[in-house]
């Protein structure tokens, strides 16, 4: 029996190490258990590479078995300590090697040195410009590790790798000691190059870059390692602790052993995102009419605050386990926050963990500043009482005086937090430590009213929470839901699009690119198999950029702009079939371009653009300066954006096609043939038979649509109620009794229940719960295979697939892709396929590849090539490690050895099902989805116009006419309508009166003149249907709340100061309103 390892909790470091700020919470000083020692020989690293190749090539439902095989072989041959292996499988979660400070550019320079390449040679340029197209060259681009593999393979003389897993880990430790220079990295990488094959170096490079590209993350890996592993990881974020605590697969944790602990970072609970986010649906999902909590949504950084020793030691970390104690202070008297709040707790509070948001408070203007100012505020002006400072806004308490509170209901935790037992007069710490503003509600009306109040106080939105739920680490569900307001001139979401071209300006913008053509990427992501992505034109943007932005666009990219020839457009651009809307004066190659963030009022159909619709009144909100022209380094939180990371067509369709609808043949051209699945006729369920009430908002897929389940009994992991919720989540109805026509699908693991035996007497199929789990893992309802049936009717026994095993059925691989099509696995057994499919059925199969299946196919082809080059000795070692115990690509003489894996009715079944779900969830999180559309097989047909984001009503639309699409480049306020908050206008509209100063009146008169001169329309009534903005002076802002309330419908209006108008005129463009709200 395993024993717990003792832990010595070391306080987190507070100073910089080797001049570098720590990026992850420090690992715990951990003592290895006495019997958790590896006594066998570590395998050669190429064995792990073989497993990684298989993980990359296998379908999701096969990865769990492969992982359990890896871990089982390791325990048998090496020992119980799997940490050296798991840290290689999850490099981005390795806290002992948090950063290598090695990105693609540095690795490219190092390998140019190691391979003795001439700097300007083609090979060197392929490494340096690894994302750029290679013309007609067969060499891959877009995947740096694969580019390196090709260059190394062409020059390496290493036929068999010499390094073990232990040796590779030691070399990686050397690379991660801190920030080094190229001359320091080269000797270590050269040692790797001299002892590793090109294949091994490819995987080492992926480990260094912390992205293995195997579509599996911590949930899948840890679920295969141990049933309790993910629960423990969620509360400690420490792989070593997980591996050393759960080294014995037979040991199970008690519930109190997965509690939160002091000075251990954990993965916090996050907000879910609803497909249909109307306030009524949000209220239903959150439990209305039961009471719920509404909190103000804050624009800061999620932070955990740990304190112990009656305030002697403090620890701050982000939701991604980044340690910020060096900023805020580890001890009283230190940092930009701890020194001011160290005395805030009651004397009897020995230790505590708080969850909250770190904001920036400006004491001069008495308001919170933008999130981007947080780090500078935390670093500077420790002793300046007038300078902006960090302010921790608390919304939850999770630990108190050695007791974890995460399993207490939210209502209890809230009551304790505000009881006066935690803080001494927290109001005395205003601007440093505060409660999040919150209120109770019971319906959509309460949400609407509180949202209005938050907007009136210049807030961002709400978070609505259920009161009767526990705190769930690393969860993003409907227990917490985010609510944001909508404004009259913009949609709820901004888009990140790539610039494809531009038009020369006139007048004041003469000689500059004044309008930009932007597009959406066709490839969903960079898989390294194409030279570069192609783009469909989407919108043109000429507003929102300042004078300096136009200068940067012209000067930094002067050599990249090329004349556009309408008769011979560049091949990467897919244009609209009609008109000149997307025919620019100049274009720019994607690899030289940059990404901009755009907001707009709505989406409208438009045949003049390649995608078939465009944005109405688009405005540039932010420019992501490309790496080559940036004059500064990105910080830890920043994300590089380029042609591979800009918004894709699929991303766009996902964002603006909610709620999702399954495609059917009635939706127009480009019809997709589907394999027919025999399903029970939908019945109208009498309310008494429905059982628990579940919201339609919880439905995420249509796997079981048109099916009704009668679940008699569940499993230990999924009791009856949970199983009902699961099938509902995937589109099914459920009933508490069999339907009159006996069409409800009966689910039970056995026939012990009298209700089940009654169904059997009527000849009704009784199906095991595993059928549900396996169907979800494959994203389609499986046929009734014998191994899933407790009792089979004569009709089921006559079924085509009844006597096939799941393994045999998988060879045909009717795995539903994300667009609803069925796929034939090219590696499927041809004989089996012919045996169970007739010609007519084959014609019904849509053989268009989904993105993930294409990646797996290419990975299998790559695997075949690599396996064909194995030496006899390597093949023997692979066989000993289970890599050749089943059919490897190209082998035909080996058979699967997993016949019994699903037939054994034991705890292994439920663990396997749980593991399959974890693998599936990892794939969902790790990639951009492919979505329903009516695009044809060739991909050239237009998709259906999104369901939401499109406005089919002319009333209340922006613009002087429904045909207006863009802001005017010369008259920047044209198409906008302004109400000026003067005392005279207030009287006309029945608003509160005021006596503004002469200066205030003068400023508003001047602003009105500027608006009219630059195309704006001034409205005297706040009820004007076209109203978009309200101008309010800082010195007469008493009507802010009143105007916010009275102009909220149908969408809210921007309330800005006269300074916004003046700065827009100076910059000759529309600027971001968020920076100009009245005080």
Curated annotation (Swiss-Prot):
Compartment(s): Nucleus
Species assigned in the record: Cryptococcus neoformans var. neoformans serotype D (strain JEC21 / ATCC MYA-565)
Composition-biased stretches (Basic and acidic residues): 848-878, 900-914
Sequence ranges assigned to domain BRCT in this UniProt record: 699-789, 968-1078
InterPro entries, per database record: Adenylation_DNA_ligase_IV (IPR044125), BRCT_dom (IPR001357), BRCT_dom_sf (IPR036420), DNA_ligase_ATP-dep (IPR000977), DNA_ligase_ATP-dep_C (IPR012309), DNA_ligase_ATP-dep_cent (IPR012310), DNA_ligase_ATP-dep_CS (IPR016059), DNA_ligase_ATP-dep_N (IPR012308)
Record: residues binding Mg(2+) 2: 460
Binding site for ATP: 295, 297-298, 302, 357, 395, 460, 465, 482, 484
Name the UniProt record assigns to this protein: DNA ligase 4
Stretches the record annotates as Disordered: 1-20, 838-942
Catalytic activity: ATP + (deoxyribonucleotide)n-3'-hydroxyl + 5'-phospho-(deoxyribonucleotide)m = (deoxyribonucleotide)n+m + AMP + diphosphate
Pfam families documented for this protein: BRCT_2 (PF16589), DNA_ligase_A_C (PF04679), DNA_ligase_A_M (PF01068), DNA_ligase_A_N (PF04675)
UniProt key word Nucleus: yes
Main location: nucleus
One of the GO BP terms on file: DNA recombination
Gene: LIG4
ATP-binding keyword on record: yes
Entry superkingdom: Eukaryota
Residues bound to Mg(2+) 1: 357
GO CC terms: DNA ligase IV complex
Function: DNA ligase involved in DNA non-homologous end joining (NHEJ); required for double-strand break (DSB) repair.
EC numbers, comma separated: 6.5.1.1
PANTHER family per record: DNA LIGASE 4 (PTHR45997:SF1)
């Amino acid at each position: 029996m395993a024993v717990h390892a003792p832990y010595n909790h070391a306080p987190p470091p507070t100073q910089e190490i080797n001049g570098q700020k720590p990026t992850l919470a420090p690992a715990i000083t951990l003592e290895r258990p006495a019997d958790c020692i590896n006594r066998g020989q570590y395998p050669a690293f190429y064995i792990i590479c073989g497993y990684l190749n298989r993980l990359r090539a296998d379908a999701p439902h096969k990865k769990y078995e492969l992982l359990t095989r890896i871990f089982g072989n390791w325990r048998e041959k090496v020992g119980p300590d799997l940490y050296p292996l798991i840290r290689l499988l999850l490099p981005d979660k390795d806290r002992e090697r948090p950063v290598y400070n090695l990105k693609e550019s540095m690795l490219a320079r190092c390998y140019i040195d190691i391979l003795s390449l001439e700097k300007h040679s083609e090979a060197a340029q392929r490494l340096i410009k690894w994302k750029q197209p290679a013309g007609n060259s067969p060499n891959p681009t877009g995947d740096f590790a694969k580019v390196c593999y090709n260059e190394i393979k062409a020059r390496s003389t290493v036929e068999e790798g010499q390094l073990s897993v232990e040796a590779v880990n030691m070399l990686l430790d050397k690379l991660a000691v801190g920030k080094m220079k190229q001359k320091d990295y080269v000797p270590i990488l050269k040692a790797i190059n001299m002892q590793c094959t090109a294949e091994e170096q490819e995987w080492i490079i992926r480990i260094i870059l912390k992205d293995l590209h195997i579509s599996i993350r911590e949930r899948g890996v840890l679920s295969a390692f141990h049933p309790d592993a993910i629960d423990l990881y969620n509360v400690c974020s420490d792989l070593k602790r997980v591996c050393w605590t759960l080294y014995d697969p037979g040991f199970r944790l008690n519930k109190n052993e997965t509690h939160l602990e002091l000075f251990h970072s954990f993965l916090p609970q996050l907000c879910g995102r609803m497909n249909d986010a109307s306030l009524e649906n949000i209220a239903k999902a959150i439990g209305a009419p039961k009471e719920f909590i509404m909190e103000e949504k804050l624009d800061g950084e999620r932070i955990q605050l740990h304190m112990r020793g009656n305030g002697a030691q403090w620890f701050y970390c982000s939701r991604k386990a980044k340690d910020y104690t060096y900023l805020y202070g580890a001890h009283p008297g230190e940092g930009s926050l701890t020194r001011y709040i160290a005395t805030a707790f009651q004397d009897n509070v020995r230790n505590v963990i708080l969850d909250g948001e770190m904001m920036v408070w400006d004491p001069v203007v008495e308001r919170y500043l933008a999130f981007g100012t947080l780090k500078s505020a935390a670093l500077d002006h420790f002793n300046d009482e007038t300078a902006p400072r960090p302010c921790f806004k608390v919304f939850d308490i999770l630990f108190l005086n050695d007791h974890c509170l995460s399993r207490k209901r939210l209502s209890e935790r809230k009551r304790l937090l505000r009881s006066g037992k935690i803080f001494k007069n927290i109001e005395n710490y205003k601007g440093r430590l505060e409660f999040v503003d919150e209120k109770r509600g019971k319906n959509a009306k309460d949400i609407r009213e509180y949202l209005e109040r938050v907007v009136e106080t210049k807030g961002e939105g709400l978070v609505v929470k259920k009161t009767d739920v526990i705190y769930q680490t690393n969860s993003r569900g409907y227990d917490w839901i985010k609510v944001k307001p909508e404004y009259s001139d913009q949609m709820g979401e901004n888009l990140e699009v790539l610039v494809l071209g531009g038009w020369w300006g006139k007048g004041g913008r003469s000689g500059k690119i004044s309008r930009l053509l932007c597009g959406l990427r066709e490839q969903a992501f960079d898989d390294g198999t194409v030279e570069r992505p192609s783009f469909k034109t989407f919108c043109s943007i000429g507003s929102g950029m300042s004078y300096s932005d136009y200068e940067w666009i012209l000067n930094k990219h002067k050599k990249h702009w090329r004349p556009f020839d309408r008769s011979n457009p560049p091949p990467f651009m897919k244009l609209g079939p009609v008109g000149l809307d997307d025919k620019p004066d100049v274009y720019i190659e994607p690899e030289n371009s940059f990404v901009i963030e755009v907001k707009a009022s709505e989406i409208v159909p438009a045949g003049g653009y390649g995608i078939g619709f465009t944005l109405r009144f688009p405005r540039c909100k932010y420019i992501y300066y490309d790496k080559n022209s940036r004059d500064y380094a990105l910080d830890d939180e920043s994300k590089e954006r380029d042609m591979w990371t800009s918004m894709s067509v699929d991303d766009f369709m996902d964002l603006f096609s909610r709620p999702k609808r399954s495609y059917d043949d009635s939706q127009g051209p480009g019809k997709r043939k589907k394999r027919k699945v025999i399903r029970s006729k939908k019945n109208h369920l009498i309310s008494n038979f429905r059982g628990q009430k579940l919201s339609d908002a919880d439905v995420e897929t249509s796997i079981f649509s048109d099916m009704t389940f009668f679940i008699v009994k569940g499993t230990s992991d999924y009791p009856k109620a949970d199983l009902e919720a699961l099938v509902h989540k995937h589109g099914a109805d459920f009933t508490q009794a069999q339907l009159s026509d006996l069409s409800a699908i009966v689910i039970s693991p056995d026939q012990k229940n009298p209700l089940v035996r009654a169904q059997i007497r009527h000849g009704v199929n009784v199906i095991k719960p595993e059928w549900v789990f396996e169907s979800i893992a494959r994203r389609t309802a499986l046929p009734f295979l014998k191994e899933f049936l407790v009792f089979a009717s004569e009709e089921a026994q006559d079924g085509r697939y009844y006597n096939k095993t799941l393994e045999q059925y998988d060879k045909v691989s009717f795995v539903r892709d994300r667009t609803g099509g069925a796929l034939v696995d090219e590696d499927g057994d041809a004989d089996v396929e012919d045996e169970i499919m007739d010609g007519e059925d084959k014609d019904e199969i849509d053989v268009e590849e989904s993105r993930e299946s294409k990646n797996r196919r290419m990975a299998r082809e790559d695997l075949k090539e690599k396996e064909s080059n194995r030496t006899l000795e390597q093949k023997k070692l692979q066989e000993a490690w289970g890599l050749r115990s089943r059919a490897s690509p190209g082998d035909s003489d080996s058979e699967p050895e997993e016949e019994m894996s699903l037939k054994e009715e034991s705890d292994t079944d439920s663990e396997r099902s749980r593991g399959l779900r974890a693998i599936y969830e990892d794939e969902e999180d790790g990639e951009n989805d492919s979505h329903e559309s009516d695009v044809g097989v060739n991909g050239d047909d237009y998709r259906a116009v999104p369901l939401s984001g499109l406005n089919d009503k002319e009333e209340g639309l922006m613009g002087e006419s429904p045909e207006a699409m863009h802001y005017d480049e010369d008259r920047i306020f044209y198409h906008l309508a302004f109400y000026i908050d003067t005392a005279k206008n207030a009287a006309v509209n029945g608003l509160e009166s005021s006596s503004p100063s002469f200066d205030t009146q003068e400023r508003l008169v001047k602003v009105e003149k500027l608006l009219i001169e630059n195309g704006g329309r001034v409205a005297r009534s706040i009820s004007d249907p076209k109203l978009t903005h309200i101008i309010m002076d800082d010195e007469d802002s008493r009507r802010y709340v009143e105007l916010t309330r009275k102009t909220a419908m149908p969408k809210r209006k921007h309330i800005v100061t006269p300074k916004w108008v003046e700065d827009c005129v100076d910059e000759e463009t529309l600027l971001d309103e968020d920076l100009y709200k009245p005080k």
